[in-house]
């Protein structure tokens, strides 16, 4: 299963690297062992018998961070990303939800804004990639 997840992440992140104009994109270098040893929770979305999307969740008592949300390019623009974000909102009772993406990743930014996230700040990574952090506060 970890190998399927790794292949899916690489297919999706290859597109994001192009969108960001990134020559050195760390998610594309993630080793198989990293998926297998992760303390985070992974969820998959299957379509037509294929792993079409997946997300990695880092859940804490008061906050839930969507560490990664990827959709295979063959399944782009089908509402799968929104379905996964909604799954998180429905299944985690956090006060705060966060997610990050490359600042130039228009499709991801659009998705997160439509799902009720608000931009909190932008920053530059050590690899020269401009990122944006989004947050959604849940009223308790």
Question: Whereabouts are the PLM-identified features?
Answer:
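Conserved acetyl-CoA-binding loop of GNAT-fold acetyltransferases
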Residues: 113-121
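Conserved beta-strand-loop-alpha-helix junction that forms the acyl-donor binding cleft
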Residues: 76, 99-109, 125-130
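Conserved acetyl-CoA-binding loop-helix of GNAT-fold acetyltransferases
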Residues: 68-71, 77-90, 110-114
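Conserved beta-strand in the GNAT
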Residues: 44, 50-58, 65-70
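Conserved GNAT acetyl-CoA-binding A-motif
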Residues: 85, 91-103
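Conserved GNAT-fold acetyl-CoA-binding loop/helix
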Residues: 6-33
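A short helix-loop-beta-strand connector motif used in the catalytic cores of GNAT acetyltransferases and
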Residues: 32-44, 65
